[in-house]
Regions:
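Alpha/beta-hydrolase superfamily serine-hydrolase fold, recognizing
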Residues: 1-119
Length: 119
């Protein structure tokens, strides 16, 4: 599994490089595309989830949650830091995993709470 993590991180970095056009990290560009830069009091409620083996959880998702809370924007966090399951990026679609099923249920609850017109 650790080799899978390195492969996933490599893929994500290549994806970012495809958008930035650089072979190195362009911190200013990456900062400019972060949703953190665009938070306002009118920002809608957010549901955010990340896997315990997804490096974007610690580098993007958790800082985003902190910024949302600082702005008092409603945020529903779905993280499993102590899970024994190997939860990679997009674990939410691996429905054989217990965490995925729980996240799906929390997603439905979030939609029911903030978008009641759908139900």
């Amino acid at each position: 599994a650790p080799n899978e993590l390195k492969l996933i991180e490599w893929g994500v970095l290549n994806l970012v490089q495809s958008y930035t056009g650089n072979k190195k990290d362009d911190a200013e560009f990456l900062k400019s595309i972060s949703p953190i830069q665009y938070l306002t009091p009118n920002y809608p409620p957010v549901l955010i989830s990340g896997g315990n083996k997804d490096f974007l959880t610690r580098t993007q998702s958790l800082p985003f949650v902190k910024a949302l809370k600082n702005q008092e924007i409603p945020v529903t966090e779905v993280f499993y830091p102590d899970s024994k399951e190997f939860l990679v990026h997009e674990y939410q679609f691996m429905m054989s995993k217990k965490a995925s099923q729980q996240t799906f249920a929390k997603t439905i609850q979030f939609i029911q709470k903030y978008s009641p017109a759908f139900f």
